[in-house]
């Protein structure tokens, strides 16, 4: 028995001296890669770097679907308007030339061929609607401001189901050159800042200050609403909560200037046929 044990011991010693090949270090082969992901929509395209991700192969990349790009100026594609009000009419607004209609602190009137609203006090929001209703359409209006300052607001109302509860969309400009889209869906709610979809963005396309003219345009088609200023695209939403036809008109919100006045020189709409 002792002899067998010695023999096995002598056999193990040389085997222990035989080198085994070592695995190559994973850390020596691994590297850091950066993948670039591109996202795009009808408004703009942004590029962001995503660190510590594996670069996708061609087979892994999703198919890019074409988008419906906003037209530069919708009126160039839609032809003649279906409806226009200007200095020769204003018969669809329940106000006649020479009238002075007082609603709370706001006076609505027609003079010098323009439909005007003027607020004698600050802090009052007032709208005035056309009796017509439109569905999918492009709506455009030429506004002129009087004396104003800062965050005095004015603009277009659309998709308003009735005259009284204020439900609808409000394409808003301020005297100091900001824009937004107010979405008021609750008839029992007051006008609030949390109804604003864009957070009051500044735009160089807006002619800011008193005694200025701006052309406001709204493309409304189902859940898509696009905003235009002076015939150039501003921004859009694609999840509009109010999608049914409704009245349209103008509004004024004197937040800084007593006596703030706006005038509507012309308003037109074009029907969008899907």
Where are the model-predicted features located?
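Short, aromatic/His-centered strand-loop micro-motif at the edge of beta-sheets
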Residues: 189-217
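Short tryptophan-centered beta-strand motifs in secreted/extracellular beta-sheet-rich domains
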Residues: 87, 139-141, 207-227
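Short, tryptophan-glycine- and acidic/Ser/Thr-enriched carbohydrate-recognition patches
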Residues: 81-105
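Short carbohydrate-recognition loop motifs
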Residues: 104-125, 251
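Ser/Thr-rich, Proline-interspersed low-complexity disordered segments
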Residues: 17-84
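Flexible glycan-contacting loops in extracellular carbohydrate-active proteins
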Residues: 237-265
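Secretory/extracellular carbohydrate-interaction modules
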Residues: 119-190
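Extracellular beta-strand elements of beta-rich domains used
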Residues: 87, 265-269
């Amino acid at each position: 028995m002792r002899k067998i044990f010695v023999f096995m011991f002598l056999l193990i010693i040389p085997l222990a001296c035989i080198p085994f090949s070592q695995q190559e270090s994973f850390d020596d082969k691994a590297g850091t890669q950066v993948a670039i992901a591109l996202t795009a929509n009808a408004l703009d395209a942004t590029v962001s770097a995503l660190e510590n991700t594996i670069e996708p192969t061609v087979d892994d990349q999703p198919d890019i679907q074409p988008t419906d790009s906003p037209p530069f100026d919708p009126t160039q594609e839609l032809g003649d308007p279906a409806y226009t009000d200007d200095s020769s009419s204003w018969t669809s607004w329940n106000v006649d030339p020479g009238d002075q209609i007082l609603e709370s602190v706001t006076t609505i009137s027609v003079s010098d061929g323009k439909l005007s609203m003027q607020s004698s006090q600050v802090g009052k929001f007032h709208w005035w609607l056309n009796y017509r209703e439109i569905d999918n359409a492009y709506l455009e209006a030429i506004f002129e401001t009087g004396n104003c300052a800062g965050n005095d607001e004015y603009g277009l109302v659309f998709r308003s189901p009735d005259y009284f509860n204020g439900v609808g969309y409000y394409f808003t400009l301020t005297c100091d050159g900001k824009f937004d889209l107010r979405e008021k869906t609750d008839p029992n709610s007051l006008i609030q800042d949390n109804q604003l979809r864009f957070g009051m963005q500044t735009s160089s396309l807006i002619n800011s200050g008193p005694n200025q003219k701006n052309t406001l345009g709204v493309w409304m088609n189902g859940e898509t609403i696009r905003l235009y200023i002076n015939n150039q695209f501003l921004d859009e939403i694609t999840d509009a909560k109010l999608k049914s036809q409704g009245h349209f008109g103008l509004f004024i919100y004197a937040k800084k200037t007593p006596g703030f006045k706006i005038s509507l020189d012309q308003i037109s709409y074009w029907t969008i046929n899907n």
